[in-house]
Amino acid sequence: MISTNQFRNGSAIRVDGKRFTILSFQHVKPGKGHAFVRTRLRNMDTGAVIERTFRAGEKVESIRTDSRPMSFLYRDGDLYYFMDQETYEQVAIPEDVVGEAKDFITPNGEVSVLYADGEVVSVQPPAHVELEVVETDPGVRGDTATGGSKPATLETGLVVQVPLFVSVGDRVRVDTRTREYQTRV
């Protein structure tokens, strides 16, 4: 059990029998009445984001989480297979648990797999990944009236806006949190 005064972003808690990750929290002390903590929580099982208010000092159950580095091996149907880099065990993770991270996973690519209560709850790619451009329109010299960017399909199927000078075969760095082009590598 932890007090609402001990909340930290990324902490895992159990509320009403459901597992949540704390996305953000704010302690509020109104002029009248008791202090409270306003939070944004992500359900670990469904991915839904909710807002919840707790009384200051209220106790909630904390969940032990463990993050393990893993390498992506292959995909078979809707299962993604990863290898734990410490124990060399293979772990099969369903596509719905992998979620949006699938857009950034390449063969032998490293990810962080989050376990809660001994079960996989999420797959998190690194903050930046380098992916190859497999399809994009050729950039026409002097064509900057459209803002200087064009859509490009990357090797994982992700489509991002890239500058006109990027062509098929180039490798680009993408920010996995914003899903935006960063630079050509």
From Swiss-Prot:
Subcellular location(s) per record: Cytoplasm
InterPro entries cross-referenced by the UniProt entry: Elong-fact-P_C (IPR015365), NA-bd_OB-fold (IPR012340), Rib_uL2_dom2 (IPR014722), Transl_elong_fac_P/YeiP (IPR020599), Transl_elong_KOW-like (IPR013185), Transl_elong_P/YeiP_cen (IPR001059), Transl_elong_P/YeiP_CS (IPR013852), Transl_elongation_fac_P (IPR011768)
Domain of life: Bacteria
Broad class of where this protein is predominantly found: cytoplasm
Pfam families given in the database record: EFP, EFP_N, Elong-fact-P_C
KW Protein biosynthesis (keyword) present: yes
GO cellular component: cytoplasm
Any one biological process term the GO annotation gives: peptide biosynthetic process
SMART domains: EFP (SM01185), Elong-fact-P_C (SM00841)
Keywords: Cytoplasm, Elongation factor, Protein biosynthesis
GO MF term list: translation elongation factor activity
Cleavable signal peptide: none
Keyword hit for Cytoplasm: yes
Associated pathway: Protein biosynthesis; polypeptide chain elongation
Function text: Involved in peptide bond synthesis. Stimulates efficient translation and peptide-bond synthesis on native or reconstituted 70S ribosomes in vitro. Probably functions indirectly by altering the affinity of the ribosome for aminoacyl-tRNA, thus increasing their reactivity as acceptors for peptidyl transferase.
Family, similarity comment: Belongs to the elongation factor P family.
Name of the featured protein: Elongation factor P
Species of the source: Rubrobacter xylanophilus (strain DSM 9941 / JCM 11954 / NBRC 16129 / PRD-1)
Taxonomic lineage of the native organism: Bacteria, Bacillati, Actinomycetota, Rubrobacteria, Rubrobacterales
